[in-house]
Amino acid sequence: MSEQDIKFEVCVDSLSSCIEAINGGASRLELCSSLFSGGLTPSYGLMKTLKEYIENHEISIDIFVMIRPRSGDFLYNQDEITIMKHDIELVKQISNQCSSFSGIVIGLLNSDGTIDKCNTEKLVELASPLSVTFHRAFDMTRDYIESFNTLNSINCSTSNNNNNNNSGGGCGKISRILTSGMESSVLEGIDTIKELIKLSNGTDITILPGGGITQKNINKIIKKTKLKEYHISARTVSDSKMQFRNTSVFMGGSLRESEYTYAIVDKNKIQGFINKSNTN
């Protein structure tokens, strides 16, 4: 596998992290807010400012936007589905102006631990022609084979709908499943990931390993999976530049980030991943 084959998607939740990821050689950005919460929908301001940055600097990179209206589980009510639809429509508007915004990231479940096929299919169709990644809500499902088959059936259904539609336009599809193999990290779930890779053969779905991937284990993961894309964070913790600090006031609940530190992508870590992957 040549060095050009390996691509790294980097999750980012600030413009500074976006710039670091781009300068570090990321192939794709997963654009979010609040990575502390697992990633939520980014603000319009962040999307527009990133659009302006890549246009002004003539940068070519794929950007997939997280569509997740709140933290917590992935069981959404109809009001939350409506919010997600509006957010997808906004991403499509930005995509029409800037082709780098080429995909969205979603994940919806039923209360019994199955994929919410009905609403997922609606969002995939609405997102067309953007690519769709189904995120690690997949790892929270009750059965990975059942879940994969459900997502693949959505692709088959949307393809048939597109063939029967004479209005033109792209065909909405789920292009990737982001997964740690139903475990807390990719290495722990590697056997399940290998089974998912087998299931994906002959389909339009690419398995995208993500979760606990480090420079120390990336070579092992590449050798075991033989995939060409991996999802990483590559973050470091930076100290706040605030000189005055009121340590008696907190902006969140008991489980929260400190107001005086923040995580940011480190371009050197991304370059380290790239260098490590080139040794395979």
UniProtKB/Swiss-Prot annotation:
SUPFAM superfamilies found in the cross-reference section: CutC-like
GO molecular function: copper ion binding
InterPro entries: CutC-like (IPR005627), CutC-like_dom_sf (IPR036822)
Keyword annotations from UniProtKB, A to Z: Copper
Top-level taxon of the source organism: Eukaryota
A Pfam family it matches: CutC
HAMAP family referenced in this protein's UniProt entry, alphabetically: CutC
Protein family according to the UniProt entry: Belongs to the CutC family.
Functional note: Involved in copper homeostasis.
Protein name according to UniProt: Copper homeostasis protein cutC homolog
Organism: Dictyostelium discoideum (Social amoeba)
Top-level taxonomy: Eukaryota, Amoebozoa, Evosea, Eumycetozoa, Dictyostelia
Gene (UniProt): cutc
